[in-house]
Amino acid sequence: MSPPYPVEILTLFPGMVTGYLGASILGKAQEKGLLATTITDIREYAEGKHRVTDDAPYGGGAGMVMKPEPLVAAIEAAKARHPGARVLLMSPRGPTFTQATARELVRHEAGLILVCGRYEGVDERVMAHLDGELSLGDFVLTGGELAAMTVVDAVARLVPGVLGNVDSSVTESFEEGLLEHPQYTRPPVFRGVEVPAALQSGDHARIARWRRWKSLVLTHERRPDLYARVVLSKADQKLLARREEEL
């Protein structure tokens, strides 16, 4: 059995992270020895009675900046615990995290060290101790904790054995550059809306055709940016020429 995929999160607010990492799929992954998470309070590496981790910015301005001394000390300690792990700061100025990023990170078996920023940002001198920065998109959060949990969740789902169904991570949205097809469960009719006939047919080939067709249609309608990058096969082109009742 392979060793668990290691993740360490450096944060000023461990309580924000603890509950999420211990619940649902992530909690079960740790119980099964597939994922190993460590949550480190950056304040443990701050000196002085009050363990101060922030200070006013040089040049003036609103807010406070995270000090380099405790943060670099925490990063160095995490690196010692996880040799070779990628060290990434959750930051709005980093490249946008995508499913492709998650696949790249899970292949790095030495694991991840995620640094959660706070306040107006992090002293620039910390950057020399990172492997990079990572963003969820063009918006600003109060801190990096939510972003870090998102990254851990997406990466952990790709660790072999974490998802009960081996096909689950392969058929989800974005794995083929397409949105996932809609899902239905019982009852077959709810408030007059019926589950598509193809899904009730028991014909696996027909079900696969419907799912592929719906995935293509949804992506075209809702994410034209993704659809523009899709290379349609001849089979896809034939599917798109058909109506739903013809599938």
UniProtKB/Swiss-Prot annotation:
It comes from the Bacteria. Keywords: Cytoplasm, Methyltransferase, S-adenosyl-L-methionine, Transferase, tRNA processing. This is tRNA (guanine-N(1)-)-methyltransferase. It is found in: Cytoplasm. S-adenosyl-L-methionine binds at residues 117, 136-141. Its EC number is 2.1.1.228. Signal peptide: none annotated. Pfam families: tRNA_m1G_MT. The lineage of its organism: Bacteria, Pseudomonadati, Myxococcota, Myxococcia, Myxococcales. PANTHER family: TRNA (GUANINE-N(1)-)-METHYLTRANSFERASE. GO terms for biological process: tRNA N1-guanine methylation. Specifically methylates guanosine-37 in various tRNAs. It catalyses: guanosine(37) in tRNA + S-adenosyl-L-methionine = N(1)-methylguanosine(37) in tRNA + S-adenosyl-L-homocysteine + H(+). One of its GO terms (cellular component) is cytosol. It comes from Myxococcus xanthus (strain DK1622). Homodimer. It is an enzyme of class 2 (transferase). InterPro entries: Alpha/beta_knot_MTases, tRNA_m1G_MeTrfase_C_sf, tRNA_m1G_MeTrfase_TrmD, tRNA_m1G_MTases_N, tRNA_MeTrfase_TRMD/TRM10. Belongs to the RNA methyltransferase TrmD family. One of its GO terms (molecular function) is tRNA (guanine(37)-N1)-methyltransferase activity.
